[in-house]
Amino acid sequence: RLPNGICCNGRQIRTIDMVQFGDEIVLTDCEVPSTLAPSAAAVPVLGETDSYIVYNKPAGMPVHPSQGHHGDTLGNVFAAQFPQLPFRPVYRLDSDTSGICLIAKSAYAAGQLQGSTRKTYLALVCGELSTGGTVDAPIGRAEGSVLCRCVRPEGKPAVTHYTPLRSDGTYTLLSLRLETGRTHQIRVHMAYLGYPLAGDRLYGTSSE
């Protein structure tokens, strides 16, 4: 609760208090500065307004700081550009996934943008897939691992829709849409079907 965060006619009130027509409402806009270490890494900016900025995140860059990644994330890049703002990604992408990341510049913008996007992914999988489909299989943490996920009955609901775009018989390019956002969801679901992502050392085979 901020001092004088919401005032009605000069008097501080709560969000649950009633107001009347004609009351003067004043909101204090107080953003907490970023606590992330700034990074000078160059990440392409696809667009920017007063409310948000859109980055083209490269593969290999985490969105959030985590164990082993304290200064090389998209959050650190944002902190270098906007040290006075907290880092508010509207959604996240896995570290190994490249693509568009939308970052809100205020709590209000984050609320307005939440759920307003529809993401489509492209993935190259091993094997030939001629028809599309849907994988509706729960995903949970693999036994004894802090990193790997797998399909397991007690996992969280996860739904992936996939459509083949092109295949040379050895690999297939897929367009995918997710109804949920579980960690490694595309990688886990495609490996579960028997079509792991090409080059995926975690869920593919050693020869891929």
Where are these regions (language model features)?
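RNA pseudouridine synthases
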Residues: 1-208
